[in-house]
UniProtKB/Swiss-Prot annotation:
Name assigned to this protein: D-erythrose-4-phosphate dehydrogenase
NCBIfam families: E4PD_g-proteo (TIGR01532), PRK13535.1 (NF010058)
Originating gene: epd
Entry EC number(s): 1.2.1.72
Its job: Catalyzes the NAD-dependent conversion of D-erythrose 4-phosphate to 4-phosphoerythronate.
Residues the record lists as binding NAD(+): 11-12, 322
Species the sequence originates in: Aliivibrio fischeri (strain MJ11) (Vibrio fischeri)
A Pfam family annotated for this UniProt entry: Gp_dh_N
Gene Ontology cellular-component terms listed: cytoplasm
PANTHER family listed in its UniProt record: GLYCERALDEHYDE-3-PHOSPHATE DEHYDROGENASE 2
Pathway(s) of this molecule: Cofactor biosynthesis; pyridoxine 5'-phosphate biosynthesis; pyridoxine 5'-phosphate from D-erythrose 4-phosphate: step 1/5
InterPro entries for this protein: E4P_DH_bac, GlycerAld/Erythrose_P_DH, GlycerAld_3-P_DH_cat, GlycerAld_3-P_DH_NAD(P)-bd, NAD(P)-bd_dom_sf
Quaternary structure and partners: Homotetramer.
Catalytic activity entry: D-erythrose 4-phosphate + NAD(+) + H2O = 4-phospho-D-erythronate + NADH + 2 H(+)
Annotated binding of substrate, by residue: 158-160, 204, 217-218, 240
Length: 339
């Protein structure tokens, strides 16, 4: 049994814990503690009731020291609650923690990971892109087989790299990609304003519900980290839109082989059934963003929107639940790190 602690119980931290109980991994992973500066009452309430993903299937109660999760067999799981801002003071050694899932979105350097290690944890997995000095960055389904036992401090990438990189790999393996551009159409996030207010990024001073808002992205750097051969071959832009969840990614690539739409779509179908099973899905149904809410895949390719120009320029629409899909990949990578 892998003993895990979650550092940061926000959108991703809560989704990871919920996903554990909605998956087949609960008999392999035990969450022994959650470190969060908020009060236990708020932690339990937001875990039980979620505006995006609905009510949690199990009853959740709490006291000042534990979250309690009732199970169908009448037993109860308990998760220790911690409120420690200093990573070096966390009691990972006494709790015998094997792996930290750091879901704060704040920490991501090797030095941050070492603080968890020095506090007694064996390994650390960050929920967002980390520094180049980390032991590895994993996009599960693409390069998780590069994990080594000595890799102690690892990044799980981002929701967008987890979405687009498996699709890029499938197309590149089949046809060879020369270059590409990506537009991320991302739901609003909690670093935006409810109404106009001050922010260091002037575009983010504007109300999230009122505008489509361009934001900076380093997605192309994330692609280069996994595929060095694509250095300076991809560029990306990102906009935030007034929806609560689910992201669409507009991928355009120039490829070395003359193809038709069906060639591209069939490649994704084949990958979804084989090498990228449970990672990438495929649909041609007339769906909209909300239909992909709570979808555990990293990416869902909408084949009805695939276009090919002049045999070599390919455009694809790829969906993902930027919270739920990523949370499920955190669990997959956690198990891969335990081997």
């Amino acid at each position: 049994m892998l003993r895990v602690a979650i550092n940061g119980f926000g959108r991703i931290g809560r989704s990871v814990l919920r996903a554990l109980y909605e998956s087949d991994k609960r008999d392999k992973i035990e969450v022994v503690a959650v470190n969060e500066l908020s009060q236990p009452e708020a932690m339990a309430h937001l875990f039980q009731y979620d505006s995006t993903h609905g009510r949690f299937q199990h009853k959740v109660t709490h006291d000042q020291e534990y979250l309690y999760i009732d199970l169908p067999n009448g037993s109860q799981d308990k998760v220790r609650i911690l409120h420690q801002a200093d990573l070096s003071l966390l009691p990972w050694q006494s709790l015998e923690v094997d792996l930290i899932l750091d879901c704060t979105g704040v920490y991501g350097s090797k030095a941050d990971g070492e603080k968890h290690i020095n506090a007694g944890a064996k390994k650390v997995l960050f929920s967002h892109p980390g520094g180049s000095d980390l032991d590895n960055t994993i996009i599960y389904g693409v390069n998780h087989d590069t994990l080594l036992p000595e890799h102690r401090i690892v990044s799980n990438g981002s929701c967008t790299t987890n979405c687009i990189i498996p699709v890029i790999k499938a197309i590149d393996d089949a046809f060879g990609i020369d270059s590409g551009t990506i537009t991320t159409i991302h739901s609003s996030m909690n670093d935006q304003q409810v109404i106009d207010a001050y922010h260091s990024d002037l575009r983010r001073t504007r109300a999230a519900s009122q505008s489509i808002i361009p934001v900076d992205t380093k997605l192309h750097k994330g692609i280069e980290r996994i595929f060095p051969k694509f250095s300076n071959k991809f560029e990306a832009i990102s906009v935030r839109v007034p929806t609560v969840n689910v992201t669409a990614m507009d991928l355009s690539v120039t490829i070395n082989t003359n193809v038709k739409v069906n060639d591209i779509n069939q490649t994704i179908v084949n990958a979804s059934r084989c090498t990228l099973h449970n990672i990438v899905d495929y649909t041609e149904a007339p769906l909209v963003s909300i239909d992909f809410n709570h979808d555990p895949h990293s990416a869902i390719v909408d084949g009805s929107q695939t276009r090919v120009s002049n045999g070599h320029l390919v455009k694809m629409l790829v969906w993902c639940d930027n919270e739920w899909g990523f949370a499920n990949r955190m669990l997959d990578t956690a198990l891969a790190m335990s081997k």
